[in-house]
Each structure stands twice: as C-alpha cells, then as structure tokens.
C-alpha cells in the first residue's frame, strides 16, 4: 500500500481499521489518549504489533511473575535476548528457547528454519558464540498425510538451517498426539558460551550516539508476523503465507562472525536482533531499556523491494538483521568491519534524550510515539480463570490397571509408538558433530557439549509430557521441570537453570487460562525446589485449529554443568556382570501413559504423582554417586515405564542384555509411569559403596546374552526379548510410518 493510499487517522477510527491489525476498541482508545490525538496508519501499526501477545505478553505477564528468576549463578534473567548463567572460570552459558508454531503450520520448512535462525540471533546478540541447538517438536498422528508432510518439512527446515550455519543440533524431543494435527509445535533452543567481560545488552545509551542497521536487506516478508502468532489458526491462515519469513543461513553465518568481532570493539554501545516486529521492537525496546529515545531515517533502510512504505519497513520481519548503537564518530570502523564479511552496515538514526521514537521518510516525520508506550505500557490483562470441566471428572475416576494379555508383545508395541521409538530418522538429518565439541550425541538422556579449554561440559535437554499436563496442569508442570533435571543428572550434570516455551490455546477462554496458571504454578514450585531458576523464555498462545486447543505444552529447556568430563554418563549398558539397580517406587500410575493411549486410544484419569523433595534427594544422591565414579550407566524412567527404560539401555549397547526381577503387580511393574525413577548399572566391586551412597534396590544384572529377561517376584518369566529384534522394531517404527 503506497503512502497515498493509506487510510487517514479519522478513517482508521471510524472504519475500525485498527481491529484488522489486532487492536481492541479499548486499546485503540488508550493509544489515542497516550498520543493526545488519533494515530496515523504507521503509528497504529507500531502499537498493534508491540501490543500483540507475542511481543507484550499482555495476557501472560501476571502469571510469568510467579517464576523464580534469580539465583547465585544467574548473571542475566528474563528481559534481554537470552538468559546468562555463570559456569565458573570467568565463563558463562547463554541460552533461550522460542516457538515458531504458527509459521510452521502453514509453511513448515521456512517456519522451522527461521525459528532456528531467530533463536541463534538472540544468543549471539548477547555476545555469545552459539555452540549447540536443540528442538522440541509436536505433531499429530503420523498416519495422516498432512502430518507426514509437516513432520518431514519441519525436520528438513531445522536441518537445512542448522547444518548450513555450522552449529550442531545435539538433542531434543518429538511427540505425536492427535491434538497437534492442525497446529504443530516447533520450539527451538540455542546454547552459547561467553566470557563475562563480553556480555552485551540491547540498550541504546548515550544521546547523540549513532543507530545503525546491519545485515540483510528488508523485504515485505513477515509483516505482522507477531500479530499472526497472536491469533488462532483457521482456514484463512493459508492465505497468510507472506507472513512467514524466509531464512538465509549463509548470511546468518557471516552475521554471527561479524557481530562477534564487533562485540570486541569498544565502539559498540548496544545490540539487538530484529526479531518479532522487526525494526519496531528492536528500536523501541533498546530506547526504552536505556530510558532514551531514537530518531530513524527510513530512506536509509536497505530495501530489497521497491516502494516500501514506513509501515512496511517498520513491521517487516525479514531475517538476519540486527540493530546496533555505536559511539558517535566511530561509524566508518563498523562499516569497514561488516564490509569485510560482505554485509551492509548503514547509519539510519541517532539516540535522543526525549524518550520518543521518531520516524522520518522522504523529509517528513511519519511517526512520533513514546518509546516506553510501545515497549513497556501495553495493557496487562488478568484473564478470568476457570477449572476445566474435565478435571474434576478425571480426578474422581477410580483408576484400573489396564489389561495386558502378552507382556512381550506389549513391550514391542510400545517400542514402536512414535513418541517412544528411535528418533534416528530425525537426528540423522542434523549435523550433530560439527565444531567437534559434542561429547554425547542425540539418543541418550541429555546431550553433552565440551567447554573448550577446560575439563567441563554442558549437559542440555528439552522436556515436557503434555499428556500429564492436560490431565493435571499443576502436577504436570512439576513433572516437566523434574524430568529435565533427571535427564541432566543421568548425564553427569548439575542442573543450573531453565528456559521455557509456554505453548497453549486461546487465553481468552477461562479453561485455557486455568491451564496456564496451574502449569506455571507447578513449574515454579519445581524450579524453587530443584534450584533451577527461569532465565528467559517465550509464550505462544492461540495454538488452536477450528476452536480445538492443543494440549497445554509448557516445554522446559534445561542446561546443566558437568564439572569434569570424566563424569559424563550415558544410558546404555556398559559391560556384562554389572549390577542393575532401580531407584524409586513404582505405583499403578497409568493416567496419560503410553500404555493407556495405546490400549484405549485416549488419555484420562489422574496424572502420575510427584514429591519434589524426594525427587531432589534422589537426584543429589545419584549425581554424587556419578561424580564419585560409582555409576556405569544411568537412565531416567519415562514413557513406557521400566520395561521400556531397561530395553532402551540394552538397545544402546552392543551384544548386551539383562536379567531382571521386578516386584509387584506385573503390568504396573513393567509399564506404569511413576515419577522420580532411574535405572542405573554399577560395577560389582562398587556394590557396597553405591548402596551406601544411594537408596536403591538391586533388581538384576547385565548379561552378554543379547536378551532382556524380566521375572516377577515368584521368579516366573514375564517376558524374554531379543535385543536385536527390539532394536529393529524401535529403529524401524518412524521410517515405516513415513513410507
């Protein structure tokens, strides 16, 4: 739309054009009051995008305040591009997770690829070198052709971007449930390393300093992407393909190197990624955080399309762009630095003292808005909350143990459930060894990456069982954090902190808002007990298709510190003769389990219970035993229960099996999904020391028979399974479904 054709302020009000941009009548009245006049078209666009849920968190802020965000090691909590945690020796780890759900639903390859690109920029804008990527993905059932297409394209998009840019994709999770059929979830996480003195903030300090635009040129892609992410998907969403950005990983690779060199220069004052809401959010947020204003001359914006209006330039979400503030008089150094990498760096404005964001185009002022009004003063809504109707019904159900006729057949069927089955088809497309720092590759409880120049490593994982959270949001929220910590501990790491990606339906529905509140309550309590503060994250609402919401999916991304790489532990059995231990008590808990879903085609009842104090005690004991060199392998018991966990530890080894005896009712002993449980193997000579250090029950030993045999307490054989056959079933399940 050319400037001549844009509606005037009176038309915007009378024809309610602001509503098409996502502003309510009340919000538009607030804008009018803030400005003391009617806004023009560009100004209306600025407010609509900055006040969207995606940028302002206006529906979720009251809930997010419940998270613990400080801790001894926390150097930067929520509010910047990414959070930062101290790991000793003047080094810190920088990490964040974000969603790209709506774009991936309609343009899966580019949606996923640009999700990866955006999260990488958040990390290097802090001054950190990105060292690893992870992802957490949710899709419908693979029997559907549309789901197959989305799954294949999302994985290809993540691989295409990550592999080209040269950052290893080392871990993640993929789950399949019918509720994600029309609305897949694509959450990407990036982890970086930094020295303390290199930490940079997205702040525009120093009146008179120069505002520069660096990186790729601006096109019309992604306009109103943030607003698009703040509404439900519908049939008309397909028409919004232009709102999906297009990524160029090679450009981003150059941008990383140029920015990391720039960060070493004392000419740099502040730096921020142009992410959601592009130039608008980066300029308004940098000015607001510093208590300053910014003037920008939009004729100087590098444009790759002709005739772009101020509105289009400010709202474009073209990829691979950064906004920087540099000391006045040092601009040429910056231009030269970026030129060396073949990238543009242009002066397009200056920092001012009056806290206003002013935009000029073709010699005229086209917008004048208080920076704080855009970045900080979006309305905050305390949405009504109402317990979901199904919850009381599920809580009152008398839970029966599912009827299982044949334990071996059931185990094989569980190993072939896509959520449990091997994800090798996925991660074999990712380069997880590039940079040669990956110590534990995908497929174990957590990935581990070496901290170069030290004996240390970083363990990292993404976790969330959304079925449990649907059944009981508060308990499920606790379990999500606890399971992430369990995976870190099983890998030899001390849990440090989390980033989260809160994926929910429409928050304007009281039952959905109740899910949000309760799951955040549960997560917050777990974070406090396990001492893993929340250092940043992302909220993705309106994940619905035709009014049906996805399961509440607050994904947890956790990073832990492996103090010495010789403590690194993996899940597979190591040698015949080692003793097998189970830690934790098994109860007949099947609500939300893989067995329940497989046998009944749906989930119902109560989620498994969790005692966070018991969880913490077990994790501390196990980590101490690992650090004392007493543990051969460690694996948390998750989907599918003990039978699956023991089988996975055998499948990962070569030529090894196990003979195990489990007490209690057979179906529960094998397949229940009780929490805070671990399968651990120990060398025979360490038996006494291990049993002194950890409250554990020896249930059997590792054999060289290549079979897993499980007995009941009467010593009757419940099942015997050949490990090669299990491996074939487990590895073949997803490729078979995709054929």
Curated annotation (Swiss-Prot):
GO CC terms, sorted: cytoplasm
Reaction equation(s) it catalyzes: N(2)-formyl-N(1)-(5-phospho-beta-D-ribosyl)glycinamide + L-glutamine + ATP + H2O = 2-formamido-N(1)-(5-O-phospho-beta-D-ribosyl)acetamidine + L-glutamate + ADP + phosphate + H(+)
Per its record, what are the GO molecular function terms? Answer: ATP binding; magnesium ion binding; phosphoribosylformylglycinamidine synthase activity
Oxidoreductase in keyword set: no
Which residue positions are annotated as catalytic?
Answer: 54, 100
Entry binding sites for Mg(2+) 1: 98, 538
UniProt pathway annotation? Purine metabolism; IMP biosynthesis via de novo pathway; 5-amino-1-(5-phospho-D-ribosyl)imidazole from N(2)-formyl-N(1)-(5-phospho-D-ribosyl)glycinamide: step 1/2
Residues at which Mg(2+) 2 binds: 122, 273
The Gene Ontology biological process terms listed for this entry are: 'de novo' IMP biosynthetic process
Entry binding sites for substrate = 99-102, 121, 245, 317-319, 540
Q: Which residues bind ATP?
A: 57, 96, 500, 537
Primary localization: cytoplasm
Q: Which InterPro entries match?
A: PRibForGlyAmidine_synth_PurL, PurL_linker, PurM-like_C_dom, PurM-like_C_sf, PurM-like_N, PurM-like_N_sf
Role this protein plays: Part of the phosphoribosylformylglycinamidine synthase complex involved in the purines biosynthetic pathway. Catalyzes the ATP-dependent conversion of formylglycinamide ribonucleotide (FGAR) and glutamine to yield formylglycinamidine ribonucleotide (FGAM) and glutamate. The FGAM synthase complex is composed of three subunits. PurQ produces an ammonia molecule by converting glutamine to glutamate. PurL transfers the ammonia molecule to FGAR to form FGAM in an ATP-dependent manner.
- Tell me its family: Belongs to the FGAMS family.
Q: Subunit structure, per the record?
A: Monomer. Part of the FGAM synthase complex composed of 1 PurL, 1 PurQ and 2 PurS subunits.
Task: Please identify the protein, giving its name as recorded.
Answer: Phosphoribosylformylglycinamidine synthase subunit PurL
């Amino acid at each position: 739309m050319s400037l001549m054709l844009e509606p005037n302020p009176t038309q915007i009000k009378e024809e309610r054009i602001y509503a098409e941009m996502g502003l309510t009548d009340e919000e538009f009245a607030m804008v009018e009051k803030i400005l003391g006049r009617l806004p023009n078209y560009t100004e209306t666009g600025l407010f609509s995008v900055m006040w969207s849920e995606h940028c302002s968190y206006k529906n979720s802020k009251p809930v997010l305040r419940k998270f613990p965000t400080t801790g001894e090691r926390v150097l930067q909590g929520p509010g910047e591009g990414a959070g930062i945690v101290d790991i000793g020796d003047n080094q810190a780890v920088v990490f964040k997770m974000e969603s790209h759900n709506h774009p991936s639903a309609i343009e899966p390859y580019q949606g996923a690829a640009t999700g990866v690109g955006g999260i990488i920029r958040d990390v290097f804008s802090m001054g950190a070198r990105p060292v690893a990527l992870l992802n957490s993905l949710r899709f419908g059932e693979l029997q559907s052709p549309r789901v197959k297409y989305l799954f294949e394209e999302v994985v290809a998009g993540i691989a295409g971007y990550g592999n080209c840019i040269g950052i290893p994709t080392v871990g993640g999770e993929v789950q399949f449930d019918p509720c994600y059929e029309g609305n897949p979830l694509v959450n990407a996480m990036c982890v970086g390393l930094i020295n303390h003195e290199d930490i940079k903030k997205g702040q525009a300090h120093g009146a008179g300093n120069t505002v520069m635009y660096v990186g790729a040129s601006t096109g019309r892609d992604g306009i109103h992407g943030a607003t698009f992410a703040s509404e439900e998907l519908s049939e008309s969403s397909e028409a919004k393909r232009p709102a999906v950005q297009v990524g160029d990983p090679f450009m981003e690779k150059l941008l990383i190197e140029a920015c990391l060199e720039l960060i070493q220069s004392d000419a740099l004052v502040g730096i921020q990624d142009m992410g959601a809401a592009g130039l608008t959010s980066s300029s308004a947020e940098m000015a607001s955080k510093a208590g300053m204003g910014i003037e920008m001359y939009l004729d100087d914006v590098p444009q790759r399309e002709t005739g772009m209006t101020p509105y289009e330039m400010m709202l474009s979400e073209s990829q691979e762009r950064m906004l920087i503030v540099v000391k006045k008089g040092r601009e040429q150094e910056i231009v030269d630095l970026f030129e060396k990498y073949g990238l543009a760096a242009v002066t397009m404005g200056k920092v001012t003292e009056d806290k206003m964001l002013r935009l000029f185009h073709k010699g005229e002022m086209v917008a004048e808005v208080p920076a704080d009004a855009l970045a900080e003063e979006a309305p905050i809504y305390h949405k009504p909350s109402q317990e979901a109707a199904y919850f009381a019904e599920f809580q009152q159900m008398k839970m029966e143990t599912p009827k299982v006729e044949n334990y071996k057949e059931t185990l094989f069927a569980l190993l072939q459930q896509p959520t449990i089955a091997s994800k090798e088809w996925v991660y074999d497309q990712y380069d997880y060894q590039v940079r040669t720092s990956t110590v534990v590759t995908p497929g174990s409880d957590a990935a581990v990456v070496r901290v170069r120049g030290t004996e240390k490593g970083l363990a990292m994982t993404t976790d969330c069982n959304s079925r449990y959270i649907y059944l009981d949001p508060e308990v499920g929220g606790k379990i999500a954090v606890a399971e992430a910590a369990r995976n870190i501990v099983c890998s030899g790491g001390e849990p440090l902190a989390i980033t989260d990606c809160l994926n929910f339906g429409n928050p304007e529905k009281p039952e959905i808002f109740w899910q949000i509140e309760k799951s955040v309550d549960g997560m917050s309590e777990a974070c406090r007990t396990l001492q893993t503060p929340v250092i940043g994250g992302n909220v993705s609402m309106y994940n619905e298709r035709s009014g049906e919401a996805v399961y509440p999916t607050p994904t947890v991304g956790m990073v832990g510190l492996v103090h010495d790489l010789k403590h690194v532990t993996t899940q597979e059995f190591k040698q015949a003769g080692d003793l097998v231990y189970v830690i934790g008590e098994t109860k007949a808990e099947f609500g939300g389990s893989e067995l329940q879903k497989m046998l009944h085609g749906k989930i119902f009842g109560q989620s498994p219970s969790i005692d966070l104090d018991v969880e913490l005690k077990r994790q501390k004991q196990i980590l101490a035993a690992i650090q004392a060199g007493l543990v051969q392998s460690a694996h948390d018991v998750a989907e599918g229960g003990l039978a699956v966990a023991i089988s996975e530890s055998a499948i990962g080894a070569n030529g090894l099996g196990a003979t195990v005896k489990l007490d209690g009712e057979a179906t529960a002993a094998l397949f229940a999904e009780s929490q805070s449980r671990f399968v651990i193997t120990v060398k025979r000579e360490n038996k006494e020391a291990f049993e002194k250090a950890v409250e554990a029950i020896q249930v059997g030993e590792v054999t060289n028979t290549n079979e897993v045999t499980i007995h009941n307490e009467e010593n009757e054989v419940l099942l015997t399974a050949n490990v090669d056959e299990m491996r074939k079933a487990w590895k073949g399940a997803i490729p078979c479904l995709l054929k």
